[in-house]
């Protein structure tokens, strides 16, 4: 039986792998899907601190030669560092709205967004539920009605101890030299995220796609995103 291409899916903030990638389940017919729950997310325990560079180290255990990596949001920042650390193991890299706003510093939309995020982290509510509501509005994610589940509240607590992704010094030189193809995806809902994705496209020599309709969580579109990702991965598999 022919081996399926290996696809490592790296989730972002607030929700775990199961919730982040629920619309990608059909891809299991075409790929070997590996979607770990990062530390601090259900069903695991709370953590005291999250750092995207440390997460990249932790994610190395899921790499095998020829792995395709796709990361959403904070997981996209982690994936950029992972790919730079172990380029010899990657066959392709896809990032979906990584909040590496530092790369777009000087672009007004990104600067304004960073200011609002920093204000929320510094002076926003300390109650996890209220902190999460404010965060979801800022990034353009949907806000559940009613009370948050215990799982979402744990995700909120983890969010509050994340190292700000705007601090990320993306290893552009290493990534640009890496021979595998790159894809940068955004949801067409935010000038700030578009600014980041535009810089990544240029500096990485990446392909670029915009899929509107699901805000920040582009993968929740399901089939349109799945076909984009599958086509990109299958092209990367070609000799």
PLM regions and their residue ranges:
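Catalytic active-site module of serine/aspartate enzymes centered on a nucleophile-bearing elbow/loop
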Residues: 204-239
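Conserved serine/cysteine hydrolase catalytic core
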Residues: 148-213
């Amino acid at each position: 039986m022919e081996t399926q291409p290996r696809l490592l899916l790296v989730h972002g903030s607030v929700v775990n792998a199961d919730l982040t990638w629920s619309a990608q389940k059909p891809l299991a017919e075409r790929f070997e899907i590996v979607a770990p729950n990062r530390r601090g997310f259900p069903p695991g325990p709370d953590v005291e601190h999250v750092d995207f560079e440390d997460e990249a180290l932790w994610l190395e255990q899921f790499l095998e030669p020829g792995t395709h990596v796709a990361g959403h949001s904070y997981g996209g920042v982690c994936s950029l560092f992972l790919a730079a650390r172990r380029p010899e193991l990657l066959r392709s890299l896809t990032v979906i709205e990584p909040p590496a706003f530092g790369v777009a510093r000087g672009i007004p939309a990104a600067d304004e967004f960073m200011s609002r995020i920093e204000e929320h982290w510094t002076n926003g509510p300390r109650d996890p539920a209220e902190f999460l509501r404010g965060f979801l509005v800022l990034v353009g994610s949907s806000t559940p009605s009613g009370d948050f589940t215990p799982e979402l509240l744990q995700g909120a607590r983890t969010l509050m101890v994340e190292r700000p992704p705007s601090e990320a010094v993306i290893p552009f030189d290493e990534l640009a030299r890496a021979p595998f193809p790159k894809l940068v995806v955004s949801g067409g809902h935010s000038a700030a995220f578009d600014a980041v994705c535009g810089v990544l496209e240029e500096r990485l020599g990446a392909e670029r796609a915009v899929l509107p309709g699901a805000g920040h969580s582009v993968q929740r579109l399901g089939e349109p995103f799945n076909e984009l990702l599958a086509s990109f991965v299958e092209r990367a598999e070609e000799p």
